[in-house]
C-alpha cells in the first residue's frame, strides 16, 4: 500500500494545465513540422507556417497557444494499491485546475449552469474520468478542450449491418460537416463499440494518444491509415482554406458492444490538441 497526499495531485494538475496551454506536445510539434513540408497547397503551406510561428511565440513569451484555453478534461488511472490522504480526491483535482487557470492567467470558460450561464470565474469544475488499474502509481492525463472543435463532434448509433463501411462514412461525415469550424488541421478521435457514453469517452481519450502512433489491432491500424488518407483528400485544408492537410492523425479505440448495436463517436480536436501526461 502506498499513501499519497492529494496535494500532490493538485500541484501536478496546476502545472499540467499551464504547460498544456503554452507548449505544444512533442508529438504534435513533429506532426505540424511534417505537415509544413508535405502540404501541397502554397496557401496551406503558408497557413501552417503561420501556425508554427504562433506556437513558437506562445512558448517563448508564455502566451496561451489559443485564446480558448478550454475546459479541463482529466483522466486519472489510479493504482489499486494507492491510498489518498489529506482531503477529497475530486476536490484536489478541481483545486489543481483552479490554480492552473487563475495563477496561469488563463481564460475562464466554464459556466456554472448550462442554461443560466453564470461564469465560475476559475474554470472549474473540470471533466474527470477515473480508471482503477493494478499497481501503486497514479497516471494523470490533462487535456484542455476548446469548444470550436468540441462543438463539431458527433455520436452515431449505427446498426450492426452498417459494418466497417458505415463506420468510415460516419467519420467522414463528421469531418466534412466540421469543415473549417474545427480549426484544421485536426486530430480525429474515434470510439467504436460499447454504449452511447462509452464510445464518446473512447473517442475523447483517443485524442490523448501520441500522434503518429497506430493501434496494435491490425484492422484498426488499417482503418486509421485509410481514414487519414481519405480525410486529407477531402480538401478542407489548413484553416479551412483548402489543401492536402485536413487532419494530422486519426486515432481509433474499440470496445465490446451489444449484439444489436454499433455505436460510433467522433471527437474532433483542433491543430493544438493539448495533452500532458504525468505519472506520480
Predicted segments with their positions:
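Non-transmembrane, aqueous-exposed alpha-helical and coiled segments at domain scale
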Residues: 1-190, 195-280
Amino acid at each position: 500500500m502506498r499513501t499519497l497526499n492529494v496535494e500532490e495531485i493538485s500541484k501536478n494538475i496546476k502545472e499540467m494545465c499551464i504547460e498544456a496551454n503554452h507548449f505544444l506536445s512533442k508529438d504534435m510539434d513533429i506532426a505540424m513540422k511534417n505537415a509544413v513540408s508535405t502540404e501541397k497547397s502554397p496557401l496551406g503551406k503558408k497557413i501552417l507556417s503561420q501556425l508554427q510561428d504562433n506556437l513558437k511565440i506562445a512558448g517563448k513569451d508564455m502566451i496561451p497557444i489559443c485564446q480558448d484555453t478550454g475546459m479541463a478534461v482529466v483522466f486519472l488511472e489510479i493504482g489499486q494499491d494507492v491510498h489518498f490522504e489529506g482531503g477529497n480526491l475530486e476536490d484536489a483535482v478541481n483545486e489543481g485546475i483552479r490554480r492552473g487557470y487563475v495563477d496561469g492567467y488563463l481564460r475562464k470558460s466554464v459556466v456554472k449552469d448550462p442554461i443560466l450561464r453564470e461564469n465560475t470565474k476559475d474554470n472549474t469544475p473540470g471533466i474527470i474520468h477515473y480508471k482503477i488499474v493494478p499497481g501503486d502509481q497514479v497516471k494523470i492525463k490533462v487535456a484542455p478542450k476548446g469548444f470550436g472543435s468540441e462543438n463539431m463532434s458527433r455520436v452515431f448509433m449505427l446498426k450492426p449491418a452498417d459494418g466497417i463501411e458505415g463506420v468510415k462514412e460516419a467519420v467522414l461525415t463528421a469531418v466534412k460537416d466540421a469543415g473549417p469550424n474545427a480549426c484544421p488541421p485536426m486530430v480525429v478521435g474515434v470510439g467504436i463499440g460499447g454504449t452511447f457514453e462509452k464510445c464518446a469517452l473512447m473517442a475523447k481519450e483517443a485524442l490523448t494518444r501520441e500522434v503518429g502512433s497506430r493501434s496494435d489491432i491490425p484492422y484498426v491500424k488499417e482503418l486509421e491509415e485509410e481514414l487519414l488518407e481519405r480525410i486529407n483528400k477531402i480538401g478542407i485544408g489548413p484553416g479551412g482554406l483548402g489543401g492536402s492537410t485536413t487532419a494530422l492523425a486519426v486515432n481509433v479505440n474499440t470496445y465490446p458492444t451489444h449484439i444489436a448495436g454499433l455505436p460510433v463517436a467522433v471527437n474532433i480536436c483542433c491543430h493544438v490538441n493539448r495533452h500532458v501526461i504525468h505519472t506520480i
